Amino acid sequence: MARQFMAADYTTILDVKIRLGDVLPANHLARFVVSIIGQLDLQSIYAGYGEQGGAPYAPELLLGLLVYGYATGVFSTRKLERSTYESIPFIYIAGGKHPDHDTINTFRSQHLEELKELFVQVLLIAQATGVLKLGSISIDDEVVEWFRTRHSE
């Protein structure tokens, strides 16, 4: 008699409703990033947006993706975009939205100077709250220089 196997049913319909806030543990890095980004002063970034065109993605969302991406080794904007579909922490940070790689890259390029300062602020807060482990990253001019050289045109 042949062995019976349970096969995958790829036509199964899942009717599941999940609140993004319920899928990550309370102490997850993605929650920390969202919390810290919400405390930063982003007025200089908001000031650069006009009234014309469609509604842009919130700077907090795009900055959160960049910060979390850098913290977890995801630097490519194409990988960041893909992660908003495939990775629960990125989906959480993006609030279920999916900015394309060009939008993320344009945001990064247009706000490079502000982002350098904001990244340092995030790192300092992470260090002060104990989220940043000793030896993970140095917080000095090298971080800013690395960020500048990696993303200057």
Q: Which functions belong to the PLM regions below?
A:
Residues 1-153:
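Detector for conserved single-position "signature" residues within domains
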